[in-house]
């Protein structure tokens, strides 16, 4: 909780990820103050290392993708950009930014284990018994049979990771500033 309050230096929208003992920071609109997302995350990592903490960082267009990268990608700072840079010139039509971003997210999340989707352990075990080990294994499968066999939560978590279903976190309320004053009859020196 204290770390999430400390992180308000980067954005007023910070929250606690209770089950995973982590924090959420919505940096949209604030990253330019630090030279971009990479600069913001580097500053945060440096300050936390100076305090003796070593954390894993990820920035992504969705909460689900950021969580997956922070918990299951190799250690380091991971950034999935909101939009890939448009090529200066192209011989063929270029896919819109959302399509390119989604393809990049699929590529990066595919090798991560199923637990990166934040699914129940029973569902994860059932998927593994069926021979499905990583996110990429279920991305190409038909959705209806997956839902029938493993439940709708699996598809909801997959959709949250790719931004097809909105997901948000509850930001911490700003600490109340306490101001007390007292008027005296005579000036106090």
Explain the meaning of each model-derived region.
Residues 1-189:
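Gly/Gly-Pro- and Ser/Thr-rich, intrinsically disordered tail segments characteristic of DNA damage-repair
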């Amino acid at each position: 909780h204290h770390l999430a309050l400390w992180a308000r230096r980067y954005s007023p929208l910070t929250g606690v990820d209770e089950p995973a003992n982590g924090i959420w920071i919505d940096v949209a609109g604030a990253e330019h103050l630090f030279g971009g997302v990479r600069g913001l995350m580097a500053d945060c990592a440096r300050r936390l290392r100076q305090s003796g903490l070593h954390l894993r960082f990820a920035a992504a267009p969705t909460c689900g993708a950021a969580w997956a990268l922070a918990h299951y990608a190799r250690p380091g700072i991971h950034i999935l950009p909101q939009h890939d840079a448009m090529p200066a010139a192209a011989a063929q039509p270029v896919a819109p930014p959302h399509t390119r971003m989604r393809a990049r997210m699929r590529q990066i999340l595919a090798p991560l284990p199923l637990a990166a989707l934040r699914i129940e352990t029973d569902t994860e075990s059932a998927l593994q018994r069926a021979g499905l080990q990583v996110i990429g294994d279920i991305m190409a499968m038909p959705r209806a049979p997956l839902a029938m066999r493993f439940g709708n939560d699996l598809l909801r978590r997959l959709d949250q990771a790719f931004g097809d279903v909105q997901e948000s976190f509850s930001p911490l309320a700003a600490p109340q500033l306490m101001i007390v004053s007292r008027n005296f009859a005579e000036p106090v020196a």
